[in-house]
């Protein structure tokens, strides 16, 4: 039986979140054993925030939740890909569909931002 290796990165693993229909990578976040289990049990994506040092469910503030369709691990069992149905217009806290909207072009990083919502009105911090 394969066991996910949480030890290589001090208890965390990268989680690549991918749109189940389009294949687009929506975001990359970190999970520990607890958040992976919460994700598998609830059918919603849960993560560990290294910045805020807390657990969080995707969409708990914005409403843009993610329904888990499929979970895969790599050959080393130290990373997961989670295919999801994205609920709401965007996965990124900036309001963009994907967190990957900055592209390297001609020697510089160029933002190709197309926010689908205003983060200032969604996140009341």
Swiss-Prot record:
Q: Which cofactor does it need?
A: Mg(2+); Zn(2+)
Cofactor binding description: Binds 1 Mg(2+) ion per subunit. Binds 1 zinc ion per subunit.
One GO MF term: magnesium ion binding
- Give the EC number: 3.5.4.19
Query: Any signal peptide, and if so, which residues?
Result: none
* One term under GO cellular component: cytoplasm
Keyword list, A-Z: Amino-acid biosynthesis, Cytoplasm, Histidine biosynthesis, Hydrolase, Magnesium, Metal-binding, Zinc
**Stored Gene3D superfamilies:** Phosphoribosyl-AMP cyclohydrolase (3.10.20.810)
Annotated pathway: Amino-acid biosynthesis; L-histidine biosynthesis; L-histidine from 5-phospho-alpha-D-ribose 1-diphosphate: step 3/9
Q: Where does Mg(2+) bind?
A: 74, 76, 78
- Short name of one Pfam family for this protein? PRA-CH
The residues that the entry says bind Zn(2+) are 75, 92, 99
One Gene Ontology BP term is: L-histidine biosynthetic process
Give, as one word, the top-level EC class: hydrolase
Catalyses which reaction?
Answer: 1-(5-phospho-beta-D-ribosyl)-5'-AMP + H2O = 1-(5-phospho-beta-D-ribosyl)-5-[(5-phospho-beta-D-ribosylamino)methylideneamino]imidazole-4-carboxamide
Source domain of life is Bacteria
Q: Where in the cell is it found?
A: Cytoplasm
Subunit structure and binding partners:
Homodimer.
Q: What does this protein do?
A: Catalyzes the hydrolysis of the adenine ring of phosphoribosyl-AMP.
Q: Which PANTHER family match?
A: HISTIDINE BIOSYNTHESIS BIFUNCTIONAL PROTEIN (PTHR42945), HISTIDINE BIOSYNTHESIS BIFUNCTIONAL PROTEIN HIS7 (PTHR42945:SF1)
User: What's the family?
Assistant: Belongs to the PRA-CH family.
- Indicate what this protein is called per its UniProt record: Phosphoribosyl-AMP cyclohydrolase
Which gene name does the record give? hisI
